[in-house]
Amino acid sequence: VLLIAFVLFFVFLIIGVPIAFSLGLGSVLAVFTSEKVSAMIIAQRLFSSINSFSLMAIPFFMLSGELMEAGGISRRLVNIAKAFVGHLTGGIGMVDIGTSVLFAGVSGSAAADTAAVGAMLIPSMQRNGYPKGLAAVIQACAGSLGPIIPPSLTMIIYCSLTGLSIGELFMAGFTPGIVIALGIAFVTYLYAKKYNIKGERKATSGEKILALKEGALAIIMPVIIIGGIVSGVFTPTESGAIAVVYALVVGLFIYKEFTVRDIPKIFLKAAAMTGMALLIVAGASIFSWLVAFERLPRTIVSILVGLTANKHLIMILLVLFLLFVGMFIETLSATIIVAPILMPVAAQYGIDPIQFALVMVITLVYAGVTPPVGGVLFITMGIAKAKMREVLGYLPAYLGIIVLIIVLLIFVPQISLWLPRLVF
């Protein structure tokens, strides 16, 4: 049954059927060909998969991100980044990375981060001497910090599938997210030296204070969200609702960047994005059930045990597998498909579930930067008007440093685990 589902899924994917329907249709048709599985499981899984309190956080965070973007958050975050890192070698490239880090704490989505920040800063990078391909790659890699630095929609879905603590996984993403940002900045610095791209004038203390004052309300939002979750004042789902109210009040009454007439359009955009995400969750739920029914995780464990008993080597093998999967399947879908398969495998080897979850999320996110899927990369290429050949020359250096950081996380799990252990 599972083999039929796999084959049908890839056939539908190849002929251009959207991934949510590819997963759902492939699994449904596979169920109908089996005498062992009741068709009732289809309705049960479709309903139960999205009838989840934790998944209610998705529409809330989608909406809060749209409200904050409409409220002029991007411009204010850019001003903060310019004030603090604009003078460094590479100038606007460093500002782009800094802004993406700040925006990641608001959006929780790679596509939202990339589109919002890239639209403003990719043209600026090009005007400051960055080649088209390099500007596109910098923003694609920096924008992909959205699902790693909390809040993260990918992490919320992973935890809803596996039962892990959303708060712990959020905390685990902080330090690796900053380390990856520093890695991206290091490669950007080397390219800036090569192309002789200098920094801007160093901001005065007064200019830094002014930038912080103007953007303070934007920066405070992730502090409220994460602080509330960690302190136990509210759940991740409730934090999403609070984020919506906060973003609405700030954008409508304080920043006054949008009016009441703009709200329906913002809500519709968030609803469309939420619907897409939940359709993928529902479609993948039948597939995930078939994976468990056919005992695929147990089969994988028995194969891997025959290869090695070293958990670090197993992690590296799983990362290679995830890189391959992430190149062909969009990050959210890949997470839903492989999390139920690989988490039991990691548990068999005594790998910390939070560490494994974080490594999986990071690997799938950055595998998704590469062609042929390359969602965020194609967004930035469109903004930069860059061709694929202009991008491919710069991509390996950035992905190389990120893969090194992933390997570091495998061998030094304390990098990701120290903060959740300190807080929880």
Residue ranges with predicted function:
Residues V1-F424:
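Alpha-helical transmembrane segments of multi-pass membrane transport proteins
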